[in-house]
Amino acid sequence: MTVTANQVLRPRGPQIERLTDTRAKVVIEPLERGYGHTLGNALRRVLLSSIPGFAITEVEIDGVLHEYTTVEGLQEDVLEVLLNLKDVAIRMHSGDSATLSLSKQGPGVVTAADIKVDHNVEILNGDHVICHLTKDTAVNMRLKIERGFGYQPAAARRRPDEETRAIGRLVLDASFSPVRRVAYAVEAARVEQRTDLDKLVIDIETNGTIDAEEAVRTAADILSDQLSVFGDFTHRDRGAAKPANNGVDPVLLRPIDDLELTVRSANCLKAESIYYIGDLIQKTEVELLKTPNLGKKSLTEIKEVLAQRGLSLGMKLENWPPAGVASHGMLG
């Protein structure tokens, strides 16, 4: 148990209890009284609204002009098929969009496993039923996959210059969040003679494209990033206080693992002693392409991930590395 400068208890590291492959409980304790609900509610909201994921956003089905078309030999109506497609759990290793296809000859059951994927795309719930073919007929689909977060209705994603939708292109309401359910409970905790402390228990279930504990960590990172803007405000008011790490943006001190790059890209960077985001952004494209086993595809992935955070390659940093950052990739 440690105490911060203002005497507020700092909890121990989270304890993880895996319940299933997609569900886990995360326990954080001890917390000051009231902090359980403060942190639990904030984390729950971010988990449900802001964790990025992938979803099917557009569908084209041979012979289908609109959502209300009747297809002979198809047990479900088209609307039900579209609803089933929204529940396909998809993970992409790089990039923000892809186009997949599905072809199946009936009679029989059409499942998510029938979707043709490449090495960059995974279907996590291959047994998920999309539709049933009752006759000797075929179904052919083209599916557009996109990256996003939260829930986005089809109307919100329609381009402003798109006056009319292409006939046969069915736009879906997309739920990008990989988090299916989150609940939290606050229980009593005790440390030595203090019995008025909180224990936060977060029960989280995902669609399998992300681990429950990874989702909680990402939510905590998002909250930390949002709250970090108040740090400068506080320092200005205190006057005498000095920013840590010689004024270096805390984002640059985060390990490259926080970028969620593919394993190949991350290992290539670490092999070149690039451990922090601050190390990475100072490299140029030419320098990175000289890295063994790091090709143009990995370079594109790195540039896209940095751009999402308002960063780019080839940036110049003064006083890097700051005090406390060791060359072996650990904060000293």
From Swiss-Prot:
Q: Which Gene Ontology cellular-component terms appear in the entry?
A: cytoplasm; DNA-directed RNA polymerase complex
Kindly indicate where the leader peptide sits in this chain.
none
Name the species this protein comes from.
Answer: Stenotrophomonas maltophilia (strain R551-3)
Mind listing the GO biological process terms from this record? DNA-templated transcription
As recorded in Swiss-Prot or TrEMBL, the protein's gene is named rpoA
Which purpose does this protein serve, as stated in its record? Answer: DNA-dependent RNA polymerase catalyzes the transcription of DNA into RNA using the four ribonucleoside triphosphates as substrates.
Q: What is its EC number?
A: 2.7.7.6
**Oligomer and partners:** Homodimer. The RNAP catalytic core consists of 2 alpha, 1 beta, 1 beta' and 1 omega subunit. When a sigma factor is associated with the core the holoenzyme is formed, which can initiate transcription.
What does the record give as the reaction this protein catalyses? Answer: RNA(n) + a ribonucleoside 5'-triphosphate = RNA(n+1) + diphosphate
The protein's name: DNA-directed RNA polymerase subunit alpha
Looking at the UniProt entry, the stretches that span the membrane are: none
> Which leading EC class covers this enzyme?
transferase
Which stretches does the entry tag as region Alpha N-terminal domain (alpha-NTD)? 1-234
